[in-house]
């Protein structure tokens, strides 16, 4: 039986048991006292803590650190790199002060006195700040480690500082010479400061101190502003007429030397925005505008047009200050109307653009006449002509199969077209798209390598992103180790002439592979060559491949390398040699001389949209590099860069050009975007020289609008040039001390073939005409080694050829004497003249052989070699 309590139990709480409640109070007090005692014991009694260690080098013992020392980095708020930067910048600023203090005694030009005054005042103030910053942090005002003299000099040079020799030369100069040296050195000095800032900010944890970061930001802005001012001053010292040309869309100032502008054709309707023909970007909305913007397309477009200063976009409204014009959008519009490259065939000129193609009829002495326009957006619109077929490169992701204007926004679409378009132009007034070749990276440029009645072989160069495999089978991007990648290749395309709709890629060779290991990425891997070099693009594409089929050779300008190929088998190009250059950012295009013994490569530093011809831009960056081809190897000879300074509102860098076919010489006409057109003589590949130019002022006075000349080519006696924004220009060369009337006339007689395509060179020949002989003679006359009476002898011989009374024997003896003299001369033009005189005799002999009434015969002794 269970025992039970006769009375129910109640909870034991203080309310019912006062004694228990008191007990709890006593217990709590005792426990609190014990806790206090324990805490005091822990505080007052040393305990063994876990050690904090800083390891030494391998094999060396670790160092034990106190907690306050271990946390010192985060507590300090600055890094060793910050300290080094400030210490170096003090030295850097002091040299700027030293240079500025030279100004007042060496020039009285107020603009220079103002620059020097600003520099001296600002640099002294900044030195004071930097010294205070270091002192407050218990840091030395100078670097504690003193490198060797040679290392220190190199370190200072990398900071943009002038050498001791340069400072001495500056101190000993006066007037304009001083002004030029001062600005050149000071701009480089300021550029060095910007480089130091950029280097520091790349480092993790640097400039964490808000005061230091604000100082660096202000310093960077101030140095860049001063560079812009000095750039204008330095350009003003130039005696080149191209420096300082007034801006304008249709009314820009012009400068020409040994060239004449014959015609300037604006873009036809449908190939420009009538409300904004200059392509000036819209103004950005001001942050102070509180009203909610109307985001409708109509409102946005209307606002854009209202913000333009004029229909041409020549003027600017709303400038905040002299140095800070109103900001404009940096985004690209859906459609671009930029003119690009050209191709010629007979009397047909095809002008490509991002928007399509314009076909013109050209006749000697006449203004080109528009035949028809093909609207087919897709960029960049490079063109070639083969018979009745017109090829067009398309690269943009918004390009459409149907040439539609609406673009494509879907990530994957069957309507997207990127590759090579093929048009039938047998009816020039009604071109028809008859074929397409889709490619993984689109088509930036293309080269017609070979063609006959059956097929056309084309090399395709894609430089854009690799499209997704879901859109085009076989397109693999940058996946490590995957040899199926579309990178590091060119495409070989076959176009059946009678059925261009069956055009296809027949191979995509890996032309950059390591010839020993077979690794696809076998050439330049990208990056800088050394601490002072240009940053060169990775070689995973070719921008241009210029083919010279008759010589079985091609030159590839392939992003990070210049390459020559053997194309004896057009389907399997074989790399012969590859070079790189510390001054090249992006190997862009290539042109052979007529003999195929030289190649001129261009560097498109800045991508064509940046100002790269300012007074302080290096003369071997964004330039041409000229190579001789010796035993199938590229041998560097020289650089050439546009000598005229351009402004920061002018995109300028080396771009497309072609040979001017003057017999006996290597002459090149070239587009430099807003730098204009330059004609150079590189007959002496070690010493290229400019012999002519044409240039306009910038499109806009305060904003960089991408424009200028895309391409300039010689064709049938005239130079045709596509102006990105303004349209098509036609120019001629004029006689000068560099180029005679006979040489220009001989070039006009040159046989370039029936077709001229941008990346396809044909051997040029000249007829056996007296004017060609006189062109050679003019070249020899310029040489100091030419016999004084040679010109008299040649002219006498040419006169004898036209005189029916002269016997064949007289002509034979005269020829023998002349050719003996010419053959003994070590001069290219002498060899050319000797051969031409023989041709003239042979040509006359052939003519006379068909005339039974002519009694003159030529002895066998003068038979041609």
State each model region's role.
Residues 50-238:
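All-alpha RGS (Regulator of G-protein Signaling) helical domain and cognate RGS-like helical scaffolds
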Residues 80, 84-87, 177, 184, ...:
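Short, solvent-exposed segments of well-ordered alpha helices
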Residues 239-782, 796:
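Feature marking well-ordered beta-strand scaffolds used for ligand recognition
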Residues 86, 93, 100, 116, ...:
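Generic L/I/V-rich hydrophobic alpha-helical segments across diverse proteins
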Residues 749-865:
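Soluble extracellular-acting proteins and domains
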Residues 185-188, 192, 199-202, 232, ...:
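Short basic/hydrophobic patches in alpha-helices and adjacent helix-turn junctions
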Residues 1-29:
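N-terminal secretory signal peptides that target proteins for export/translocation
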Residues 33-46:
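Bacterial N-terminal signal peptides
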